[in-house]
Amino acid sequence: NAIKDPVEKHTHVTITFTQGGQLRFVDPRTFGEMFLATPDEITSEIEELSSLGVDPVETPMSWVDFGHLLRSKSQSLKAFLTDQSMIAGIGNIYADEILFDSGLRFDRETGSLTTQEIRRLYRSLVEILHEAIKYNGSTLSDGQYVDLFGKAGDYQSHHQVYNRDKQPCRRCRRNDIVKTKVASRSTFYCEVCQV
């Protein structure tokens, strides 16, 4: 931000640079934390970083390795995708989009997938994340999730299920998207297209 830019609501920390500009930590939901550490200290000082799982964008893996990871813990597919100790960086929005794209329900158990379904889930995971990055992520109606320059993303206009409850499924056109609660989080899916 430029120093003259108005300070947004929920700005918790502002760092002003000597050569101009500011870095602002804006956290409306107060999920975030800020730490100061050297590169060598970062994982020892910030315990959460040492337990992060694989980053599927920065460190691609084979679908076979993904399958081993998937089967290493018995849980629902949505819980697996959003478990940061397994795969880093996938939140609620992208978990729903990945599951829809792969044709799999959120409540399927990790151990129930066939080899073909594992390959499909992995392909969807990679493709959805890269597509979301291409469109600068998802900026929802509350204006959250913008880039470092305050520019909104546009992937939300490509959402197939997330935040589209009671709207027709874009794939089957026979059913409306359903919204349910799972672990206190909204989950969106198509009862026809996802098995």
Identify the meaning behind each predicted range.
Residues 1-195:
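Structured catalytic/nucleic-acid-binding cores of DNA maintenance enzymes
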